[in-house]
Regions:
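Ser/Thr/Pro/Gly-rich low-complexity linker/stalk segments immediately outside membranes or between
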Residues: 56-78
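N-terminal post-signal-peptidase region of extra-cytosolic proteins
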Residues: 98-103, 112-136, 179-183
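An N-terminal structural lobe/cap that precedes and organizes the functional/catalytic core
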Residues: 85-94, 99, 111-116, 147-154, ...
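N-terminal Lys/Arg-rich, disordered targeting/topogenic segments
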Residues: 1-34
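Domain-level detector of nuclease and nuclease-like folds
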Residues: 134, 143-262
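A charge-rich, low-complexity, intrinsically flexible signal that marks solvent-exposed coils, linkers
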Residues: 2, 30, 34-38, 87, ...
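Acidic, glycine-anchored loop motifs typical of Ca2+
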Residues: 107-109
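Hydrophobic membrane-insertion alpha-helices, especially the h-region
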Residues: 36-56
Length: 262
């Protein structure tokens, strides 16, 4: 038989705390200073546990009431069309299933990493005249706001990494696990979902969605979230409830934000 559970109210918390204090007073000799401290610690732990249970719910409700999770504008409109799926699984994920850097969709013989570097860096030089391989350049990093001098080499190339705006593992969880190889390879090498970025920021993000990671450069957050929405719309990928709320909270600050063009 199923049972309905409700979250404890503040009155419940207060009553529970009082009852706990009475029990501890009976159990221990409160004339002892050490045991007084112990009583306070026990009560603090109990209250802390109950607050931990209640606060997430309160925070979510406050967000709804204050309009934090309400946004309007072109990007927000597209977000509202995305499927919401909280039953996501990373089982079976393997980065190699997306064939990153294994295709040449435009047939120019250039590696997609070098194509992104050539697009996103300034003052670009190549290892050979007329070639594809980027030797050096300057990145004005959108994630951090830093300016990074890129120089190709075993010890220096990692300063600038190629970032999947919608991470491959997040895509897998959001629907890519059901794709065929051709579609996964297309996604893994789609320039629309690729960005040259600070290596440390890319590593810090990992496979996190907008619910758990946003660029430290606040000026880029609206465009970043809009890009993720654009990618997910293009490939019919879902979002989780938390992810959607995080996106709406960002877009709430920029109602004119559009989906970036390809």
């Amino acid at each position: 038989m199923s049972r309905n559970h409700r979250r404890p109210s503040r009155r419940d918390q207060a009553e529970f705390t009082r009852n706990t204090a009475r029990y501890v007073n009976k159990r221990f000799n409160v004339s002892n200073p050490f045991e007084r401290v112990l009583i306070l610690l026990v009560i603090a732990v109990v209250v802390g546990v109950m607050v931990g249970v209640v606060l997430p719910k309160i925070s979510s409700e406050v967000g709804e009431l204050t309009g934090e999770y309400a946004a309007s504008g072109p990007a927000a409109d597209v977000l509202e069309t995305l499927r919401v799926d909280d039953d996501q699984s990373g089982d079976g994920y393997d980065r190699d299933l997306f064939g990153y850097r294994e295709t040449d969709d435009d047939g120019d013989g250039c590696d997609v990493r070098d194509e992104v570097l050539a697009r996103d860096l300034e003052d670009v030089t190549f290892t050979t005249p007329g070639g594809c391989q980027v030797q050096s350049g300057v990145l004005h990093d959108l994630y951090t706001g830093k300016t990074i001098d890129f120089v190709r080499g075993p010890q220096t190339s990692s300063a600038v990494q190629i970032e999947h705006v919608v991470a491959l593992e997040n895509a897998w969880q959001s629907g890519a696990r059901d794709w065929d190889t051709a579609k996964r390879y297309k996604f893994g090498n789609d320039m629309y979902n690729l960005l040259a970025a600070d290596g440390e920021a890319n590593s810090e993000k990992g496979s996190a969605s907008a619910a758990y990671w946003l660029p430290t450069n606040a000026d880029f957050r609206c465009e970043y979230v809009a890009r993720q929405i654009g990618v997910k719309d293009k490939y019919d990928l879902s979002v989780t409830t938390q992810e959607k709320r995080a996106m709406l909270a960002v877009l709430h600050t920029c109602p004119a934000q559009e989906i970036p063009a390809e």
